[in-house]
Design a protein with these regions (language model features):
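RNA-interacting cores
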Residues: 17-18, 30, 70, 75-82, ...
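Short gly/ser-rich anion-binding loops that grip negatively charged ligand groups
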Residues: 51, 63, 83-94
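Membrane-interface interhelical loops and short amphipathic "cap" helices
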Residues: 1-10, 37-40, 64-86, 136-155, ...
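Residues within alpha-helical transmembrane segments of multi-pass membrane proteins, especially transporters
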Residues: 20, 24, 54, 61, ...
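Long, contiguous internal "core" modules enriched in hydrophobic/ aromatic residues
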Residues: 14-18, 38, 91-93, 98-213
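N-terminal signal-anchor module of multipass membrane proteins
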Residues: 1-45, 50-58
């Protein structure tokens, strides 16, 4: 039981963070495809972007508690590049900073044109994907042979696409309540969710098979 409690913050970090990241990936896909979102829809979308950001902030707090003493979090700078856990947190912090900057710039009305908004949201989504890969690599520990494979990363990416797309799709549909998402944008959101579910199932099945060997 003590071991479960000790690892709970890390599990919460990975789960909550992946959902927040996936929401930004879903929003980027919709923004890139849907070039005709009205000003009112964009304003609502920018306000609701606070939801995945809150997810990410909560996840980061969980990560700090996994360190044992949150006050020692500043010491992670000494292990950048040598500790998978540190690399994971640093990559996530970079993503979160970019996401917050994007959100604030959008709220200020500086991303009304489709081009700059699509590029900026794409950068945030790419940083999120890198962060998810780092999360998966943090679990690939030589001391635990079952985890020491790329399939853990596959699981994280699948969970990110599935959970994040559900959150991002909900936010997008709340933003464009007068006119539903264009068919192509809505189709891509659904495709991302199905792809995420498939990837998650494959990753889980392979790891389960490894356990049985």
């Amino acid at each position: 039981m003590d071991a479960v409690i000790k690892e709970l913050p890390l599990a919460l970090f990975t789960t909550i963070a992946s959902v927040g990241i996936g929401a930004f990936v879903a929003m980027f896909c919709a923004i890139y495809v849907n070039k005709s979102m009205g000003a009112g829809s964009l304003k609502r979308l920018d306000k609701l972007t606070a939801v995945p950001i809150v997810f990410c902030v909560v996840a980061l707090i969980c990560a700090f508690f996994h360190l044992g003493d949150p006050l020692h979090a500043v010491n992670i700078v000494n292990t950048i590049g040598s500790s998978p856990m540190t690399n994971e947190i640093v990559a996530f912090c970079v993503f979160l900073v970019l996401a917050v900057v994007y959100w604030l710039v959008a709220l200020a009305g500086k991303l009304e044109k489709h081009g700059p908004r699509a590029v900026f949201s794409g950068i945030v989504a790419l940083a999120g994907l890198v962060s998810c890969i780092m999360m998966g690599l943090a679990y690939a520990l030589p001391a635990i042979p079952i985890w020491n494979s790329p399939w853990g990363t596959v699981q994280v990416l699948g969970a990110m696409l599935l959970g994040g797309t559900l959150l991002g799709g909900t936010i997008l549909n709340m933003s464009v309540r007068e006119t539903p998402l264009e068919g192509e944008a809505d189709g891509r959101i659904r495709l991302l969710a199905m792809l995420g579910g498939l990837v998650l199932i494959i990753g889980t099945a392979v790891l389960f098979g490894i356990c049985l060997l």
